[in-house]
Every structure is written in C-alpha cells, then in structure tokens.
Swiss-Prot record:
The lineage of its organism: Eukaryota, Metazoa, Chordata, Craniata, Vertebrata. GO terms for biological process: box C/D snoRNP assembly. It is found in: Nucleus. This is NOP protein chaperone 1. The gene is NOPCHAP1. InterPro entries: NOPCHAP1. The keyword Nucleus applies. Client-loading PAQosome/R2TP complex cofactor that selects NOP58 to promote box C/D small nucleolar ribonucleoprotein (snoRNP) assembly. Acts as a bridge between NOP58 and the R2TP complex via RUVBL1:RUVBL2. Interacts with NOP58, RUVBL1 and RUVBL2; the interactions are direct and NOPCHAP1 bridges the association of NOP58 with RUVBL1:RUVBL2 even in absence of snoRNAs. The interactions with RUVBL1 and RUVBL2 are disrupted upon ATP binding. Residues 143-152 have a biased composition (Acidic residues).
Length: 185
C-alpha cells in the first residue's frame, strides 16, 4: 500500500514489487487461492501454459459412404443429360409442340388433377380427428348405413365446402371489375 508515493509495508503481504508500468504488484495476492498452481494470474493470461492438452486429443474418424449419396450422384448426370436432350428437342421442334396448354396431338392422354391447398387451424384439426374416430366407429358397426355419414362428402359444392376461418362471420365479397359489369355500361 502506498501513501503519497511512499510504499508502506503491511503485515499480511510481502513487500510489493513493481511491474513495467510502475504499479506495485503483490505476488501473494496474485497467487491467492491457487494452492500453488499460479492462481488468478495464470487464469487471466491469454498465453498461460496450457493445462494437459495431450491427454484430450481429438481423433478424426472416417464416416461410411451414404447409399443415398451414391443414388444422388448417379441421378444428377442422368437429369443433366435429359435436360440437354429436351433443350435440343425444343430448339428443333415447331414452336407449339412443347406448349403445356396445347394438349392436342400425339400427347393427348392427359390426367387433370384439381388440388386445393389450405392451412388448417386448431379447431379444424380437432374436427378432423373426431371425424376420423367417428368413421372408424362407423366402419366397426356394420348395421349403420354409409348415407348417414356426412363428414366425407362425395363432391365439394358451395353448400358443403368448409373454408378456413369461416367461423368468425361471413366474408365481404366485392366485385371490382368483371365482364358482366362492362356489358351493362
């Protein structure tokens, strides 16, 4: 401890030494609580001696080759060849041959699929679960007729369609511009 620039000895500490900046450093305080291992001084130093890194060495292990990776690597060149073949055919063919809206001609076999995609909310998923349970119960009871089960309609119409969030009230439909309104004018 210093008073007005003069060092004063304390009974519990050894005489302080000065580091390169002129600040007194007590070796006892720096090694306190270390049990002779260097104390806080070694913990604060970035380049302190490493603890035993030799005992905890990491090992590199070779991973087996994935069969999925093999399949992908054989598929990608086939896909590239097919794309190149299609580009060449498109360049040599008449303009309307590869039009997906033109289904006339040799490729007239077309399967049309109408798919609706919507997000179900929590109440919808509970109703689906209950309808699945009721359909399982009805399949177990052979005495009930299938006409009474309205949970699985055969055709979607305006009367039986269920739109998400339709419980909150009716939506507002506003026609801004239509061919019928143009004919009236």
């Amino acid at each position: 401890m210093e008073v007005h620039g003069k060092p004063k000895a304390s009974p519990s500490c050894s005489s302080p030494t000065r580091d390169s900046s002129g600040v007194p450093v007590s070796k006892e305080l720096l090694t306190a609580g270390s049990d002779g291992r260097g104390g806080i001084w070694d913990r604060l130093l970035i380049n302190s001696q490493p603890k035993s890194r030799k005992t905890s060495t990491l090992q590199t292990v070779r991973i087996e080759r994935s069969p999925l990776l093999d399949q992908v690597q054989t598929f990608l060149p086939q896909m590239a060849r097919a794309n190149e073949k299609l580009r060449k055919e498109m360049a040599a063919a008449p303009p309307g041959r590869f039009n997906i809206e033109n289904i006339d001609g040799p490729h007239s076999k077309v399967i049309q699929m109408d798919v609706a995609l919507f997000e179900m909310n929590q109440s919808d998923s509970k109703e689906v679960d209950s309808s699945e349970e009721s359909s399982q119960d009805s399949s177990e009871n052979s005495s009930e007729s299938e006409d009474e089960d309205d949970s699985i309609p055969s055709e979607v119409t305006i009367d039986n369609i269920k739109l998400p969030n339709s419980e909150g009230g009716k939506g507002k439909i506003e026609v801004l511009d239509s061919p019928a309104s143009k004919k009236k004018k």
